[in-house]
From Swiss-Prot:
GO terms for biological process: ribosomal large subunit biogenesis; translation. This is Large ribosomal subunit protein eL14. GO terms for cellular component: cytosolic large ribosomal subunit. SUPFAM superfamilies: Translation proteins SH3-like domain (SSF50104). GO terms for molecular function: RNA binding; structural constituent of ribosome. PANTHER family: 60S RIBOSOMAL PROTEIN L14, LARGE RIBOSOMAL SUBUNIT PROTEIN EL14. NCBIfam families: PRK04333.1. It holds the Pfam family KOW. It comes from the Archaea. Gene3D superfamilies: 2.30.30.30. The keyword Cytoplasm does not apply. Belongs to the eukaryotic ribosomal protein eL14 family. The gene is rpl14e. Keywords: Ribonucleoprotein, Ribosomal protein.
């Protein structure tokens, strides 16, 4: 089981969407993945994100690589994860 995999639900740690949950849709390379909220559920737009800015959760969604926002939204509703996705997480920024 890989931690960074298509369908893994993660929490964004930085940026304007910090604390919001998103789903990994595609793996671009060793450092970047394509994520979506989708925007209608968690407010996260479909975009490329550095994996160091994500915190993976233990939940996954069964989607195919490159799935559309509508497909992701349908799977989230099917698995009953919509309320989980809407919850915000308080992000703790480490002090250096």
């Amino acid at each position: 089981m890989a931690i960074i995999e298509v369908g893994r639900i993660c929490v964004k740690l930085s940026g304007r969407e910090a604390g919001s949950k998103c789903v990994i849709v595609d793996i671009i390379d060793n450092n970047f993945v394509l994520v979506t909220g989708p925007k209608s559920i968690s407010g996260v737009k479909r975009r490329r994100v550095n994996i160091s800015h994500l915190e993976p959760t233990d939940k996954t969604v069964e989607i195919g690589k490159g799935a559309s926002d509508q497909e992701v939204e349908a799977k989230l509703k099917e698995q009953g994860l919509v309320d989980f996705m809407k919850e915000k997480v308080k992000v703790k920024i480490p002090v250096i």
